[in-house]
């Protein structure tokens, strides 16, 4: 998984920067801690929209994992991790159009929509004007894509006693 995530980061960088990115890319342990940090904070929010117990990293796209790791950096007290988070956010933001263009089926996958929403959320709360403006311009798109995604819902029998 780390290799796929690193490849995603390397696809959108200048050739002269690749060696520095490879050396500075987080270890699997750090990525795991960032993902755990995200879920530990996400779970206690008033509106959690990712279900941590059913999250399986091996079944997610590298874009989604990078977006979650990016969100995990916001809870760290390290400027280095914050810088990493901004870089990861930019990689995810740039990779999403390519991902959706590569296969129309990806637009119907829940993890892809969750990646998109998380990328927008991170941009909105980044405090960087450029990132905030880009995220604001994309806020409507997940609502447009949502009807095409198959999301399992709990189906309750309708009983006349409920009315």
Describe every region a protein language model picked out.
Residues 1-67, 71, 91-96, 116-163:
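Intrinsically disordered, low-complexity activation-like regions
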Residues 81-83, 128:
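Elongated alpha-helical scaffolds that mediate protein-protein interactions in large eukaryotic proteins
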Residues 98-107:
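Flexible helix-coil transition and linker loops at the boundaries of alpha-helical arrays
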Residues 106-117:
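Amphipathic alpha-helical protein-interaction segments enriched in hydrophobic
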């Amino acid at each position: 998984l780390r290799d796929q995530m690193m490849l995603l980061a390397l696809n959108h960088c200048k050739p002269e920067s690749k060696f520095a990115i490879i050396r500075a890319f987080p270890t699997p342990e750090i990525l795991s801690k960032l993902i755990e940090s995200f879920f530990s904070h996400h779970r206690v929010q008033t509106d959690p929209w990712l279900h941590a117990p059913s999250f399986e990293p091996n079944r997610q796209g590298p874009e989604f994992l990078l977006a979650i790791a990016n969100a995990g950096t916001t809870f760290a007290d390290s400027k280095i991790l914050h810088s990493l988070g901004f870089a990861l956010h930019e990689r995810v933001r740039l990779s999403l159009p390519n991902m959706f263009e590569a296969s129309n089926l990806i637009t119907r996958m829940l993890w892809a929509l969750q990646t998109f929403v998380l990328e927008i959320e991170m941009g909105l709360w980044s405090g960087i004007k450029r990132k905030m403006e880009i995220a604001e311009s994309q806020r409507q798109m997940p609502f447009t894509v949502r009807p095409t995604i198959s999301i399992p819902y709990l189906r309750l029998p309708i009983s006349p006693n409920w009315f």
